[in-house]
Swiss-Prot record:
Keywords, alphabetical: Eye lens protein, Repeat
Record's keyword annotation contains Coiled coil: no
GO molecular function: structural constituent of eye lens
Pfam families: Crystall
UniProt similarity note: Belongs to the beta/gamma-crystallin family.
Origin: domain of life: Eukaryota
Domain called Beta/gamma crystallin 'Greek key': residue spans: 2-40, 41-83, 89-129, 130-172
InterPro entries membership: Beta/Gamma-Crystallin, Beta/gamma_crystallin, G_crystallin-like
Region of interest (Connecting peptide), ranges: 84-88
Subunit structure: Monomer.
Keyword Repeat part of the UniProt annotation: yes
Name used for this protein in its record: Gamma-crystallin-1
Organism: Xenopus laevis (African clawed frog)
Length: 175
């Protein structure tokens, strides 16, 4: 079972809240989030309620300030516990929206999309198996986007404001 602790101050100080499941609105439990301790499971955190805004992928460990989870500010307002997935991973990406243009199929991580297939704009994708994270920059940096099995006809379907994806990786449990 997963468990995550949110702290209002850096270095695990101040008011805190313990969470063990999905919450669509954490606003009533704390005003800001400057440090996090994950004691179990993998989590996706969201900047705004209802799983909106910037997304952050965290696993077991300590995050003494929001820069450690690549946060842009101290706002965490919703969270999702990621289910344990043991199967295969499969995803198709497309260089244009609505599954048009060049298509590539992936079963593993890609630290640099430009080096791998000479473009870094992904306009649509289809996740068949597994859970994946897209990153705006190479080497798993920049804004993050969580994708679970399903169809993503346009980049805004996964929460992005542009099609730029510099890297992606499979979400697997890091207990």
């Amino acid at each position: 079972m997963g468990k995550i602790f949110f702290y209002e101050e850096r270095n695990f100080q101040g008011r805190h809240y313990e969470c063990g499941s999905d919450y669509s609105d954490l606003s009533s439990y704390f005003n800001r989030c400057n440090s996090i301790r994950v004691e179990g499971g993998n989590w996706i955190l969201y900047e705004h309620p209802s799983y909106k805004g910037n997304q952050y992928y965290l696993w077991k460990g300590e995050y003494p300030d929001f820069q450690r989870w690549m946060g842009f500010n101290d706002s965490i307002r919703s969270c999702r516990f990621l289910p344990n997935y043991q199967g295969q991973y499969k995803m198709r990406i497309y260089e244009r929206g609505d599954y048009q243009g060049q298509m590539m199929e992936f079963f593993d991580d890609c630290p640099n999309t430009y080096e791998r297939f000479n473009f870094h704009d992904i306009h649509s994708c289809n996740v068949f198996d597994g859970h994946w994270m897209f990153y705006e920059e190479p080497n798993y940096r920049g804004r993050q986007y969580y994708l679970r099995p399903g169809e993503y006809r346009r980049y805004n379907d996964w929460g992005a404001s542009s099609p730029r994806i510099g890297s992606f990786r499979r979400v697997y449990h890091r207990f």
